[in-house]
Amino acid sequence: MASLVAIAIAMALMVVQPGRQMTAFAARTSPAAAAEAFWRAAMPGAPMPDAIVELLHHEHGVASAGGKANGGGDGPPPPMNFNYDDYRALPRSDAPSPDALNRVAAVQNADENGVSSPPPPPPTVFFLEDAVRVGESLPLPRPAADATAAGAAAATALPPLRLYTVRSVRAIEGSSFVVCRGETTAGAGVYGCRDAATGPARAYAVDAAGGGGGDAVIAAVVCHADTSRWDPDHAAFRLLGVRPGGAAVCRAVADAHILPTNKD
């Protein structure tokens, strides 16, 4: 009788513990495997989106793809390939997760005189207003310090965008705004402001932190409330799955401040 009880207890432990055993094993292998095991244990039956899987394995994938590209003479692989279809299929919200619209290389090229050319403008990031919430993730341009620390050779392999977790959101009163941002050009600091939207808009001041509790960033978020006059072929409509005049389309500017204006 005692042996039967012992066998029953052992079988129960084998049934209950597989998720924990899987997580413990994955933690001893690699951070990416640990993250995937945690996802399976916490959300059984829900597949991890391809964008998250690619982000976890991005560093390894760039190294292998880069070697192949150098041998074949092709350009570097694309930094990140977010799948909007996966985000639209998520059951947690009717709105897709935020994603990047433009991909640019964060590398400065020198002209014939050896003087560095001005840095390219940061990539524009479009997303829906549902993403401006505490706990959501926003892709923002990678800080220039990241590219400098990585070196000029490795900077081409770095994705121009980096995911930040929203920690706080503060709505700015008003319907028209200007965004002000400081830039360094030719060793001199320049602080400029420009209109944030041509039509009615909503604005937010967002405090976000990089992955793993990294550097914090203050971002100005402007949501265009009326997109009825936008070009119907605008890439934001295609990627976000919305139509002109529908849901508000938002964009973020890192390290910027936003101020309301009174237009008579």
Swiss-Prot record:
Keyword Nucleotide-binding belongs to the record: no
Tissue specificity of this protein: Specifically expressed in the tapetum, connective and endothecium tissues of anthers.
Record carries keyword Signal: yes
Domain BURP: 37-263
InterPro entries per UniProt: BURP (IPR044816), BURP_dom (IPR004873)
Keyword field: Signal
Endpoints of the signal sequence: 1-18
Organism superkingdom: Eukaryota
Disulphide bridges, residue numbers: none
PANTHER family: BURP DOMAIN PROTEIN USPL1-LIKE, BURP DOMAIN-CONTAINING PROTEIN 15
Protein name listed in UniProt: BURP domain-containing protein 15
